[in-house]
Each structure stands twice: as structure tokens, then as C-alpha cells.
């Protein structure tokens, strides 16, 4: 018989989804003494933290002049949110009911009520499902040229972009600043981009457009080395040397939980008030890529998380729904991050801790628990 789900008290604010938007919203809400509850999510990205968890190196996030590993950046932002009192549930939200107040959120183990909600579930980059795609994701394959194109691994190397729209053309042009040459793989005989953008790409001597070309697979050893393609005009298979492959075939917003509950655009992105985080339902806010089909950057997501938290705080206060916590200390204790962890051993090992360090903890967790594991090698 399945365990009965726990019914919790009504929360001030629940944040669904992690990543820069969710964690930043949590920082601001926690510092406002709202003690937000953040449901990190696993299903869409496979691990909490959003798309930056699959980015090897981030060089365009303010405050890191020498760059920072994507997982390390998310670890730091998460630690800051927890330090100020954010409560974490490392599960997926299975269903959300916005038809009555307080709102109802169901996870695999809990039934949660909340007076307000911030949605930061993000958008997932569309993939092609190639045989070796997973093996080379973040090892040559990326879904964001602006995020990753300038990293050392791609400099002065042959690069490729898949897609034929404006985004694909923009990324191909952008990559010519860093790569030795860019191959644009287009399935049809014509670009779908605007005429001006198409003209610029076709006139660029550093870009080769491969018309009617289908990407079949990616090949390499530890890092991507070449692309296996099929030319439709000859029906022949061919190989293209490339150390980097960038997908520009669109994103799918993770909004299935809100179907017929909140207004979306034709692509499924949540609609908000212009320049603001309010959705079509009072007390519900959107932050990050779930409502952003254009910019999709870590720093813009973080900024939108800040706005969503401030708006939620004001709304809760205005409607006298906020129950503020009282802190024992004005300044909370220092945050624990992966860099401050002590190495786990037989005496201090705790299987319930989110972060562990060392081979002892890895062996114990691998053999004795069913938890999904995420490894960071330092």
C-alpha cells in the first residue's frame, strides 16, 4: 500500500523549478522573511538547477571574471537561497491546481497548499535524438552558441549549426567570431530566416551552407570530432569535421502542468504583463525561460526571478496573506557549498545530506540508495 502523502501547512510562496530564475526568486523571498518552498524538479532536465547544470563553462555571468563551471554557479546560488531560509523539496511537481485558493501542488510525497506561486520551470532545448547525442552533450554539442561559443574548446575550430531559421543564422554568424569556419546544416532548399538575415549568412565567406542535409549522428572519442550527414540530392552519406555542434531548432517551454489554467502564446510560453512577471492569474508569477522565448540567458533568468519574488511579496502583503518568520539571528550562518564540504567517512556519512564529498560517500550512495546521483569532478 503506497505511503499516504503528507499535508503541509499553507505556504506563503511556492517556487516550482530551480535554475537561475527559481533560486534567485528564492533568495529575494527568503530575505523578505517569507520562507519560500522551492520544488527543484528532476523530470525535464534530469537534475535540479536548470540548463546551466549541463553547461561546462560559463563566461558571461557577472561576478566571475575568469568564468565558472555551470554546476558550481548553480551550487553557489542554491546555497545562498538555502542560507536565507528557503526550504527545498527535491522532487517533481506532479500536478498543480490553480482553480481555487490556496493553490494546490502535489509532488510524489506531499500535498502542498500555497497562497502564491512562482513558475520557473524553464524551457527545454529541442534535440534530434541521435544515437550518440547524449554522449557528446556538453562535450561538443550545445543548444546555446551565445552561452558556450566563446569557450576555449571551440576557438579556432570548425563548428556547425543545425537549423534554418533566424536563430540558426544568428548563431552561425556569431560563431564566426570564434571558430575557424562554420557549417550551417539546413534540411530544406531554403532558409526560413528573414530575407536580410539570410542574405548576410549566404554572403559570409566563413559560413558554408549545406542545403538539403540531414544530420544522422555525431562521432568522436572523448570530444565531438565529426558529423555524419546525408545529402538528400544525392542520397549519399558524408562526414563533416567539426569540434562543435550547436542546435538551433527551437525550445519547448515546460508548461504542461498549466495547460488550460494560464494564458500562453502559440508556442506554449507563459504570457505575462509587459515587462512584468504577473501571469493571467492573480498571485501567480512566471520567471526565466518559461516566459522568455527570445533572450534565454542565465543572467536574464536571474533578473526575472528577482522581479517575480518582489511582485509576489508585495501582493502577499497587500492582501494580508503573508506570514513572516522571525529570525533568531539577523545574520544567518555561512552557506555550505561543495568547496566547503568535509570529506565523508564512516563516522560522519549521512545519506540524507544533499551534498557529499569523496569516494566513500559515492560508494555508499551508489550501492545502498535509489537516489539519482549527480557527480562533480574537481
Protein language model regions, located:
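Glycine/small-residue-rich loop that forms an oxyanion/phosphate-binding "nest" at active or ligand-binding sites
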Residues: 88-150
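Proteins that catalyze or organize thiol-disulfide redox chemistry
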Residues: 338-378
